[in-house]
């Protein structure tokens, strides 16, 4: 199974390491044509506005086509990229996930934290690393909330798309990546 990791900036290498440990064949995606080689895509954390600049209009359109039709997983800035609506400030998202997100809602870099929250994935509680994280302000009717922090969704799934506002790749817990690989294998939303 070939999984792409968008490797333009951000913490893409941490995702590569987790995915390879779980047995995936990982392609570091740096050009739009590489999207044709993969079955699923991870959009890592980083800076969402920088992703937009580095992708350009043509690259963004290729990314949008991929994430709206194939299994995709975004963390932090990747979740912003997958969103239907982005605010603080407003910017475009791919619309692959029916969510409204607020960028940098949990504060500045210095306010980053490692917290534990309840999660509906097998195994219960999950350690979650937040770094200038976005907050999911609203979810559409087809979005399943898998975990919350202070009443706000932090891990959501809709069809073939999975998003986390935290960084599961920075902990030893591989459950979120395992769920994504299961979604890719099943070609759909998978099972918890």
UniProtKB/Swiss-Prot annotation:
Pfam families: SNO (PF01174). L-glutamine binds at residues 46-48, 103, 131-132. The active site is at residues 76, 167, 169. It catalyses: aldehydo-D-ribose 5-phosphate + D-glyceraldehyde 3-phosphate + L-glutamine = pyridoxal 5'-phosphate + L-glutamate + phosphate + 3 H2O + H(+); L-glutamine + H2O = L-glutamate + NH4(+). One of its GO terms (cellular component) is cytosol. Keywords: Glutamine amidotransferase, Hydrolase, Lyase, Pyridoxal phosphate. The keyword Mitochondrion does not apply. Gene3D superfamilies: 3.40.50.880. GO terms for biological process: glutamine catabolic process; pyridoxal phosphate biosynthetic process; pyridoxine metabolic process. Pathway: Cofactor biosynthesis; pyridoxal 5'-phosphate biosynthesis. Its EC number is 4.3.3.6, 3.5.1.2. It comes from the Bacteria. One of its GO terms (molecular function) is pyridoxal 5'-phosphate synthase (glutamine hydrolysing) activity. In the presence of PdxS, forms a dodecamer of heterodimers. Only shows activity in the heterodimer. HAMAP family: PdxT. NCBIfam families: PLP_synth_Pdx2. Belongs to the glutaminase PdxT/SNO family. Catalyzes the hydrolysis of glutamine to glutamate and ammonia as part of the biosynthesis of pyridoxal 5'-phosphate. The resulting ammonia molecule is channeled to the active site of PdxS. This is Pyridoxal 5'-phosphate synthase subunit PdxT. It comes from Koribacter versatilis (strain Ellin345). The lineage of its organism: Bacteria, Pseudomonadati, Acidobacteriota, Terriglobia, Terriglobales.
């Amino acid at each position: 199974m070939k999984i792409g990791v968008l490797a333009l900036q951000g913490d893409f290498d941490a995702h590569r390491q987790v995915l390879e440990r779980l047995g995936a064949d990982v392609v570091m995606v740096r050009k739009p044509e590489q999207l044709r080689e993969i079955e699923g895509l991870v959009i890592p954390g980083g800076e969402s506005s920088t992703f937009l600049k580095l992708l350009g209009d043509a690259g963004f359109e290729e990314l949008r086509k991929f994430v709206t039709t194939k299994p995709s997983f975004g963390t932090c800035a990747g979740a912003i990229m997958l969103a239907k609506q982005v605010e603080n400030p407003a910017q475009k998202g791919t619309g692959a996930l029916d969510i409204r997100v607020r960028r940098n809602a949990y504060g500045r870099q210095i306010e980053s934290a490692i917290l534990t929250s309840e999660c509906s994935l097998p195994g219960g509680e999950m350690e979650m690393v937040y770094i200038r994280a976005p907050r999911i302000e609203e979810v559409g009717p087809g979005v399943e909330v898998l975990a919350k922090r202070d009443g706000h969704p932090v891990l959501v799934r809709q069809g073939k798309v999975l998003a986390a506002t935290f960084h599961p790749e920075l902990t030893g817990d591989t459950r979120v990546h395992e769920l994504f690989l299961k979604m890719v294998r099943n070609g759909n939303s998978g099972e918890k």
